[in-house]
Amino acid sequence: MKIRPLHDRIVVRRKEEETATAGGIILPGAAAEKPNQGVVISVGTGRILDNGSVQALAVNEGDVVVFGKYSGQNTIDIDGEELLILNESDIYGVLEA
Amino acid sequence: MKIRPLHDRIVVRRKEEETATAGGIILPGAAAEKPNQGVVISVGTGRILDNGSVQALAVNEGDVVVFGKYSGQNTIDIDGEELLILNESDIYGVLEA
Amino acid sequence: MKIRPLHDRIVVRRKEEETATAGGIILPGAAAEKPNQGVVISVGTGRILDNGSVQALAVNEGDVVVFGKYSGQNTIDIDGEELLILNESDIYGVLEA
Amino acid sequence: MKIRPLHDRIVVRRKEEETATAGGIILPGAAAEKPNQGVVISVGTGRILDNGSVQALAVNEGDVVVFGKYSGQNTIDIDGEELLILNESDIYGVLEA
Amino acid sequence: MKIRPLHDRIVVRRKEEETATAGGIILPGAAAEKPNQGVVISVGTGRILDNGSVQALAVNEGDVVVFGKYSGQNTIDIDGEELLILNESDIYGVLEA
Amino acid sequence: MKIRPLHDRIVVRRKEEETATAGGIILPGAAAEKPNQGVVISVGTGRILDNGSVQALAVNEGDVVVFGKYSGQNTIDIDGEELLILNESDIYGVLEA
Amino acid sequence: MKIRPLHDRIVVRRKEEETATAGGIILPGAAAEKPNQGVVISVGTGRILDNGSVQALAVNEGDVVVFGKYSGQNTIDIDGEELLILNESDIYGVLEA
């Protein structure tokens, strides 16, 4: 099952907490705060402007996005997995290698 | 009797709580929180934009929609059944198989 | 005497409480909450949009309308009868047989 | 002396309390609440829309208007008489015989 | 020294309290509330609308204007005299003989 | 070093308190309240309107401006001097000789 | 790794506190307040106006910007470095030599 988000909404799978350093050392308690990053699962068709035109979103499926500390409260369960529903305006930017 | 919703309003039949697992095991108390999903019964003619044009809604009769935790407070009784009145902006997306 | 509502306002006669079932059995105390339904008595000429055009209302005289629990606070007395003044945006939809 | 109201403002003379019934019976204390009706004394030239055009008001001098319970707080004294300053949006409608 | 108000701002000299009746009788304590009237000293070039056009103000230098009870908090001192800075929207109307 | 303000922002050097009268008499404690006047140091390129056009500001470098009592909270240090950052909408008008 | 900010967002590296004077004298405790200045690392593609056009931002990569005391709360960690996410409207201006 999947979800088709409406308009300027974006479905995001939150990045899992990293509880170990790159070198593999376990950091107990280090993951108390959930990371504000995730992978875009699907995007809406765009934001509807006052003049009726539709502005396509600036993120794409597969993008790794960073979002605000206080975003990510809206969640849905899809096949037992919790996904986030964000608005495009919740997203700060896209991480690039 | 049925209701014809105005403009960007949508009538939704809330999904019933599942109190048993897929395998049929009863989960007592598991349904304390109402599911934020439902089936679209009827949709309005569309949202009226500032320039006077009408934007048709992005959901259709029969769609299974997911909506916010704090939506679904507006209810009406039609032939003894409680239905929800949502705005299109309350809806996160449409579930697809 | 009658009232000609301005713009997007609508005059509604609230449906009387039903204190008996269809079969005629009296339900004492059953009507504690006022029904959020009524019949449209008269409608304004329409909502004025930002571009100056007038959008005719989507309800008509005689329609049975359903409105929000917290609407219906604005009342006027016409010939000794209390009528409601609603905005079109207070109205969820129109009941149809 | 008279006042020329600006734009969408309307000058209204509040209807006097009726402390007797049509049959002439005095109703002591019956007029505790001020009536939300009045006669239009003068109207502004119209509401200025975002596109710069002017929308003439939908009420005229001499109309008997009904307004909200919480409107009518803005008053001016003209030749010793207290008059109300309303916005057109404060007015529910016009009473007609 | 004088002030050139910007856009939709208006400089007003508040009418002095009248502490005597027309017949010259002194009314002690009668002027506790400042009058909400004044003479327009200068007006801005107009309100800028969303479409970029400028709407000239509907009051002119020398007009006697009435304004809201809670307007008139913004003051400036010009050559030792306190003048009011109002927005056009603070003004109810213009008094005419 | 200088600052180029963005859009409708204006950099202002606040007028120094005058602690002596024109005749040179010192007024102790007279300057408790900061004057709401200042000289414009630099102005932004203009306010961007909803239709995308840019509206040039109505004040110029060197103008003496008066601003609201509660404006002037935003300050920056340029070469050890505190300057104010105002929006054009904070400014009441321009003083002229 | 780098971040591509969306629309009117701007990534800024906050200026480090200067704890010594120009002459090299250490000022203990002088840096209690974080400086509201920083260098622009990357800028979004522009602000989307109501008419659907995109307004390019007025700051560029490498600009030294000054921003409000209460901005700069939104941070992201990029390769272990804390960067600020600002909106263009948070920025007062650009410092120039």
Swiss-Prot record, chains A, B, C, D, E, F, G:
Chaperone recorded as keyword: yes
SUPFAM superfamilies reported in the protein's UniProt record: GroES-like
A molecular-function term among this protein's GO annotations: protein folding chaperone
Gene Ontology CC: one annotated term: cytoplasm
Predominant location category: cytoplasm
Keywords: Chaperone, Cytoplasm
Biological processes annotated in GO: chaperone cofactor-dependent protein refolding
Pfam families according to UniProt: Cpn10
Subcellular localization: Cytoplasm
CDD domains on file: cpn10
Protein family: Belongs to the GroES chaperonin family.
Function: Together with the chaperonin GroEL, plays an essential role in assisting protein folding. The GroEL-GroES system forms a nano-cage that allows encapsulation of the non-native substrate proteins and provides a physical environment optimized to promote and accelerate protein folding. GroES binds to the apical surface of the GroEL ring, thereby capping the opening of the GroEL channel.
Subunit structure, interactors included: Heptamer of 7 subunits arranged in a ring. Interacts with the chaperonin GroEL.
Protein name per UniProt: Co-chaperonin GroES
Gene source species: Oleispira antarctica
Taxonomy of the source species: Bacteria, Pseudomonadati, Pseudomonadota, Gammaproteobacteria, Oceanospirillales
UniProt gene name: groES
